[in-house]
Amino acid sequence: MNNIRTIKGGVNLKGKVKVPGDKSISHRALIIGSIANGETTIEGFLHSEDPLSTADCLRKLGVNIPEIKKNEPFTISGLGLDGLKEPKEILNCGNSGTTMRLLMGLLAGQEDKNFILTGDISLNERPMGRVGKPLSLMGGKIFGREKGNKAPISIDGNKLKGCVIGTPVASAQVKSAILLAGLKASGTTSVIEPASSRDHTERMLKAFGADISVRGELGRNVVIKSGGKLIGQRILIPGDISSASFWMIAASIVPNSEVLIQNVGLNPTRTGILNVMDSMGCNYEILDKSTIAGEPIGSIKVKSSNNLKSFTIEGDILPKLIDEIPILTVAACFCNGVSEIKDAQELRVKETDRLKVMARQLQKFGAEVTEKEDGLIINGQSKFNSAEVDSETDHRVAMSLAIASLLAKGTSKIMRADAASVSYPTFWEDLATLTN
């Protein structure tokens, strides 16, 4: 794969695009299908590094997952809640925090079995205690470096007990790990979040037959009861709105552009970017709405807009657009006035420190971006000059810098551009098609 990409500024985007399957749903379809009874067929799976790491780990746990080919449905033979095997080797999660955190929850209650999880250099420096601590409250035996906060992680499967757990931050990965553990815990497990996070796990568990309910203000309290069994399903995975966001913003800020993004997941816990686009005054409409397997989908048509307004992102909306902050930082550079991103310290422990990296790289174009402890301040109406920028191995940074390059005067280079393949393997081909 080409590690350096050259992007010419001054072109517009025209056409339609179908983004890859949702990464969050792809992980969950594999995991929940593996512990269901019977067969689960998955269509629209994201064929990229992170979900494939999940598939590889599940195979080592004895799950029959065939070779996954691009753009082809496949069928898993589930083992039931008690059928996972003790692996003969270490489970390598690659660069995928979702894989590691969800597997911690899945495996904590697999009694009398031992599991070791590791990842690449980057993943092994990311915080895992936020999952390990609540699982320990349920009786989980989880160990790792730095008092259980860093991988490699060792799990001694143990009998778990249901309890009420309040999470300090709204995190779908933490919540999902607790809910997966709750399937094997005695009694009832309740998760209470400070704000609602993405709810793909709850929707999918319910579709598979789990006894799960969502309560409280804004769905912040999720309750799951053990004792049932999951039944295999047919899962159609919609396009990932986090991947669609690059085209949504590009079409908004690049003059004379019009893009139709087809079959995008519109789960309300993921559509914070639409709220921000409304604040900006973007020109878009949602077409062909429908619901498949409990997940709302539709197509998004976006046209370029003049005189976009600055915006502030803070508080409860953060979990609904946490992965879109890099591309929204690019958008802010071309709005009138000063935009601000607050309460976003979670971005410092993603694949990279995304606040620091986005500020550093956009400044190379001439952007006025100031880094704060919990966010960024962006002075809009920037005039971008061409630059040599670096993804610093972060997929969302790579794609955000590509869109920024379209607004630069001259030709820019993006180093380590192949990082995009982590979540969007065909990004560069789709960019070429839309700008041709």
Swiss-Prot record:
Subunit organization: Monomer.
Protein localization: Cytoplasm
Binding site for 3-phosphoshikimate: K23, S24, R28, S171, Q173, D323, K350
Enzyme Commission number: 2.5.1.19
Molecular function via GO: 3-phosphoshikimate 1-carboxyvinyltransferase activity
Any Gene Ontology CC annotation: cytoplasm
Active site: D323 (proton acceptor)
Tagged with keyword Amino-acid biosynthesis: yes
GO biological process, one term: amino acid biosynthetic process
Name under which the protein is recorded: 3-phosphoshikimate 1-carboxyvinyltransferase
Annotated SUPFAM superfamilies: EPT/RTPC-like
Annotated residues for binding of phosphoenolpyruvate: K23, G97, R126, Q173, R354, R396
Pathway(s) of this molecule: Metabolic intermediate biosynthesis; chorismate biosynthesis; chorismate from D-erythrose 4-phosphate and phosphoenolpyruvate: step 6/7
Keywords, in A-Z order: Amino-acid biosynthesis, Aromatic amino acid biosynthesis, Cytoplasm, Transferase
The family this protein is said to belong to: Belongs to the EPSP synthase family.
Catalytic activity: 3-phosphoshikimate + phosphoenolpyruvate = 5-O-(1-carboxyvinyl)-3-phosphoshikimate + phosphate
Biological source species: Prochlorococcus marinus (strain AS9601)
InterPro entries: Enolpyruvate_Tfrase_dom, Enolpyruvate_Tfrase_sf, EPSP_synthase, EPSP_synthase_CS, RNA3'P_cycl/enolpyr_Trfase_a/b
Record's function text: Catalyzes the transfer of the enolpyruvyl moiety of phosphoenolpyruvate (PEP) to the 5-hydroxyl of shikimate-3-phosphate (S3P) to produce enolpyruvyl shikimate-3-phosphate and inorganic phosphate.
Predominant location: cytoplasm
